[in-house]
Regions:
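Mg2+-dependent endonuclease catalytic cores in nucleic-acid-processing enzymes, primarily RNase H-like
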Residues: 1-114
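Generic amphipathic alpha-helical segments used as scaffolds and interaction surfaces in large
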Residues: 35-39, 119-123, 144
Length: 157
């Protein structure tokens, strides 16, 4: 279950930028007590993952985004399928669209602007709100893979 999906920019100079990122993540962790926080860890964001997980003790897991972003089974296209299956409910009232950050309007706008090219890949920039939701989806997918699956066999002689 996704409780909160955040995307945005944190402004600070030099070392303050990293500290501001970790402080922001700590505040969200205190508010929601998540079992896992999935963060895109391409480039410099790897340092954020390390600082939040190893130094601040937050349940942060990094994901290095690659070609799987375009795949229908684990990529951003999976979000469309989950929405068709009614596994997502996006709040849409004045309070939700105006009072939240980044706001449900940005998420809906981002999802509606996704364009798939003839090669079956996303074209152009993927909006931050959509990437944040995909990070949530990846965390859920990873949790389901790690759960113990077993089959019960009944044998009648």
């Amino acid at each position: 279950r996704v409780l909160y999906s955040w995307s945005g920019k944190i402004y600070a100079k030099g070392q303050g930028w990293l500290e501001a990122q970790v402080v922001s993540m700590k505040e969200l962790a205190e508010r929601f007590n998540p079992s896992k926080v999935m963060v895109e860890s391409n480039g410099y964001q790897r340092l954020v993952v390390h600082a939040a997980a190893d130094l601040a003790g937050l349940p942060v897991v990094g994901h290095n985004t690659g070609r799987e972003k375009h795949r229908h089974d684990v990529g951003i296209p999976l979000i469309a399928l989950k929405m068709e299956q009614e596994k997502y409910a996006i709040p849409w009232n004045k309070e939700a669209t105006e009072g939240s950050r980044p706001g449900t309007r940005k998420l809906v706008d981002g999802l509606s602007r996704l364009i798939y090219g003839k090669n079956g890949r996303l074209e152009g920039h993927t909006p931050d709100a959509v990437m944040a939701l995909w990070m949530c989806e990846l965390a859920i997918h990873e949790d389901h893979k790690q759960k113990l699956n077993y089959t019960k066999w009944d044998y009648f002689a």
